[in-house]
């Protein structure tokens, strides 16, 4: 989506979906259509898959002492087509304060603690959550225990946010439409052209007179 416009019905999007469909049963097991993050990680970490797309926490688990992949995993940006650009999905973990809280000062003080350098380093070590503070990607002490951040830094710099901000309250509906149409291509029920036409209609209906 560009500036809130629905632009999914185009040949390049259709071609990308058809390409992914062509991987099914070849370089991608058909069972992947039923996987969530942890199922994907288990297959990959057991050495039964060559590639995996997942969140940063997986790196730490793959390098654990009991992991058969310790020292054998690399991280790269998602591939792009000839005229595209490499980009990953930007997500995050957010803290928020209820506007009706009776103790806003205490709530703000707590969030400052939970989001400071020390807390983010602890979350990185214990949970594998990548920091949101850019300075930590240059911190030698942090890199000593999490060298993967040198790779993540450049990848995150090229990240593209999900359309949640643009689509506002309609994002769950948008996300569900994208999921269902993509799934229908990957399981062979329709081709990329039909899917992008269908998705264009669904997203246009969701938008209505404007995202709100």
What spans do the regions from the language model cover?
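Short helix-loop capping/hinge motifs at secondary-structure junctions, enriched
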Residues: 25-26, 68-69, 83, 100-107, ...
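Long, aromatic- and glycine/proline-rich binding clefts that accommodate carbohydrate-like moieties
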Residues: 76-77, 125-177, 184, 208-212
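Short, charged, surface-exposed loops that flank catalytic or proteolytic processing sites
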Residues: 184-197
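A bilobed periplasmic-binding-protein/Venus flytrap-type ligand-binding module shared by bacterial periplasmic
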Residues: 90-103
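Short helix-initiation/N-cap motifs at beta->coil->alpha
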Residues: 31-45
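Ligand-binding "clamshell"
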Residues: 62-82, 144-150
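Glycine-centered hinge/linker elements that transmit conformational signals in sensory
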Residues: 2-34, 78
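Paired acidic/hydrophobic, glycine-rich loop segments that form the ligand-binding mouth/hinge
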Residues: 50-54
């Amino acid at each position: 989506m560009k500036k809130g416009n629905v632009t999914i019905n185009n040949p390049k999007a259709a071609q990308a979906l058809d390409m992914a469909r062509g991987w099914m049963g070849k370089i991608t097991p058909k069972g992947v259509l039923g996987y969530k993050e942890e199922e994907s990680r288990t297959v990959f970490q057991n050495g039964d898959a060559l590639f995996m797309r997942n969140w940063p926490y997986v790196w730490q688990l793959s390098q654990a002492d009991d992991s058969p992949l310790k020292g054998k995993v690399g991280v790269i940006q998602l591939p792009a087509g000839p005229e595209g650009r490499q980009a990953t999905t930007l997500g995050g973990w957010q803290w928020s304060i209820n506007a009706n809280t009776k103790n806003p000062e205490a709530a703000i003080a707590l969030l400052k603690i939970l989001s400071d350098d020390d807390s983010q380093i602890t979350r990185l070590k214990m949970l594998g959550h990548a920091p949101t503070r850019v300075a930590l990607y240059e911190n030698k002490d942090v890199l000593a225990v999490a060298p993967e951040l040198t790779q993540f830094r450049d990848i995150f710099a090229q990240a593209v946010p999900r359309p949640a901000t643009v689509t506002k309250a309609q994002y769950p509906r948008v996300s569900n439409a994208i999921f269902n149409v993509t799934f229908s291509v990957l399981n062979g029920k329709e081709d990329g052209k039909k899917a992008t036409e269908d998705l264009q209609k669904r997203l246009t209906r969701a938008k209505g007179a404007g995202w709100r």
